[in-house]
Design a protein with these regions (language model features):
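N-terminal ordered "arm"
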Residues: 1-43
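Short amphipathic beta-strand/extended segments with alternating polar/hydrophobic composition
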Residues: 19-23, 44-52, 88-96
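Acidic, aromatic-enriched beta-alpha/helix-loop junctions
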Residues: 31-71
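Generic recognition of long tandem-repeat/solenoid scaffolds
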Residues: 76-85
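Short amphipathic beta-strand and strand-loop transition segments with alternating hydrophobic
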Residues: 21-23, 69-73
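Hydrophobic transmembrane alpha-helix bundles
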Residues: 59-61, 85-89
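A eukaryote-biased signal for long
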Residues: 88-188
Length: 188
């Protein structure tokens, strides 16, 4: 079982762009970050820090293009600022709502949490990756974004909005509401 522990933060913008950043504090690859970017035309781009991580993520999820680029990050308790050669972005979130039981079985995540995750956030906590592996998203804390700003190639993307339409990177999209989620991804 491979476990990735970190934070996924996401939202859409008036431009139609949707951005997801994963900041992984612990993983089989050590600490790293990746960006999933859905353009208004539906094109899906993965920005990864190196080819090994890019190939691994691409084996799990669907992308039209993989870019290898430095992802520069500054983070505090409730804010992330990051940039690549194309993207500049800042996410800020508010109160974090914790899940009361941290160590819960994966069967619970794939049944009870799956039901409530879909009902409330329109997201799935369990499914199969592109290459057929089983994956669980174990949410530890969730919070609504209170501000987000982004530029692509120097052009502002406008006001932050819900993550819509779905990007279909994998079996689940992030919450439809602009959100930051402390999460553990288990991949079998």
């Amino acid at each position: 079982m491979e476990i990735f522990e970190g934070r996924i933060t996401s939202c859409g913008f008036d431009s139609g762009d949707r951005i997801v950043i994963g900041i992984w504090d612990e993983s089989p690859f050590g600490s790293f970050s990746d960006i999933m970017w859905a353009k208004p035309n539906g094109e899906k781009i993965l920005i990864a820090p190196n080819k090994k991580i890019g190939d691994y993520i691409n084996s799990l999820y669907d992308f039209d293009e993989i870019k290898i680029d430095d992802i520069n990050i500054e983070k505090s308790r409730k804010q992330i600022t990051f940039n690549t050669s194309d993207i500049e972005c800042k996410f800020e979130w508010g109160v974090e709502i914790p899940f009361l039981i941290k160590n819960r079985p994966l069967w619970f995540v794939s049944t009870v949490e799956y039901f409530f995750g879909w009902l409330i956030f329109r997201t799935k906590t369990h499914g199969r990756t592109k290459n057929g592996r089983r994956e669980w998203y174990v949410v530890d804390k969730i919070s609504r974004l209170k501000n987000a700003e982004a530029k692509i190639s120097g052009n502002k993307l406008g006001k932050y909005t819900n993550f819509y339409p779905k990007a279909n990177f994998g079996f689940s999209d992030p919450p439809s509401m602009p959100a930051s989620v402390q999460v553990r991804s288990h991949i079998e």
